[in-house]
Structure formats: structure tokens, C-alpha cells
Amino acid sequence: MKQGLKSILPDPVVRFVRNSYDAIRRLPQVPDAYLHPWRRRSRIRIAQYHNLHRGQRCFIIGNGPSLRDTDLSKLRNEFSFGMNRIYLLFPELGFTTTYFASINDLVIEQCAGEIAALPIPKFLAWHSNRHFQRLPDDMAFLYTSYTGPRFAHDMTGRIWEGATVTNVALQLAFYMGFQQVILIGVDHNFTSQGDANKTVVSTGEDPNHFSPAYFGKGFR
């Protein structure tokens, strides 16, 4: 039914309907997204990064298997963004990424303790705040949604998730003023196939990321 309507309606109409539905669905979230103490503190923290790295370059590190064929030691002294479970690689690397980002609620729910313990600035989706008992000094919550400005110029307001944390990391990077942003390990190639946005439980090793344990057995 949904796909049928999309095939017969003009794109502007589809976008209008989608944006209207998302706006209605978001209404109950709006007060907390701007007035909750954690979000107020987060907005102040995020603003401090605006143009902090003006004119510099950074690397956004994906989590694809190609990382195993990449000499990541060259990034030791570079500014970098890591995402989701990239921290599984930190002990082997001998260093961390400069920043960390995650917006996937299931990932954050299952890894909240590990994420909170990371000794680097962390940017997480506001809808995941319920998985934390306190707001660490190096954590900031982003107000993300599924519609909105395609590329935000102000990361303290509402931003578009773009269906991938990589898109959020890109917006953060340019908000921070980086002039050159290089992506590595963003493979866009998955061995496993399935329906989008469907929750499944892993039954074995993960072939789609740099580590078999990334979404290993039992991970949702």
C-alpha cells in the first residue's frame, strides 16, 4: 500500500505527507528536546564546537570490513570521528578517535555503559537519553529527526538523521569548521540481506563490519 501510493503520487506530495506526519509525531517530543536540562546543557556544549577546527581536515571512520585492509596507524595524529561500535578497535589501534557519534537506539541501548566510558567527546541522539542515568561532562545529545533540513548549519537545533550516523558525523564535521572531510571504511556493501528498519537478533558472527563481534550472536 505504502509503496503503491509512492509510485502514483508526485514527489512533492509524498515529501509533504511524510514531513507532516513526522511533524505531528514529533510534537510531544518538542518541549523536552529544547527545555530538558540535559538538552539545554547539550546545546551549550555543542555550540562550543562551532568552527573549532576551521580550515583543518578530519577523517570519518566507518565500520566496514575494509578497515581490515587499511593502515589506520596513519590516523594517530589526525582529527577523526568514530561511530557506533568503532571502540572495539581502539585497543588494537592504541589510540581513540577524536570524537564519537551514535544515533541508533538499539546500539545505544545495548552499549550505553561502554559508550559512556569512552574518554572522548560523544554526540548521541536525544531519543536515546533514557538509557543513561546521568549526563557525563563529555556527552552531548543531538535533537535528530527523520525529516528536516537536509544538512544542518546549526547543530544545536533539529537535525536530519539521514538514515545513517555517517550523515550526522558529516554535519558535525562541517559545523566544527573542518574544510576537508575524508571518509574511510564506509563500504556500502552488506553480506546479510533483510528488510529496512526491521529488528533482528544476530545468530552468529557479523560479516558486515570490521569485527565478527561487532553485531555478534545475540545482538539486536
Which functions belong to the PLM regions below?
Residues K2-R220:
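Metal-ion/cofactor- or nucleotide/acyl-coenzyme-handling active-site neighborhoods
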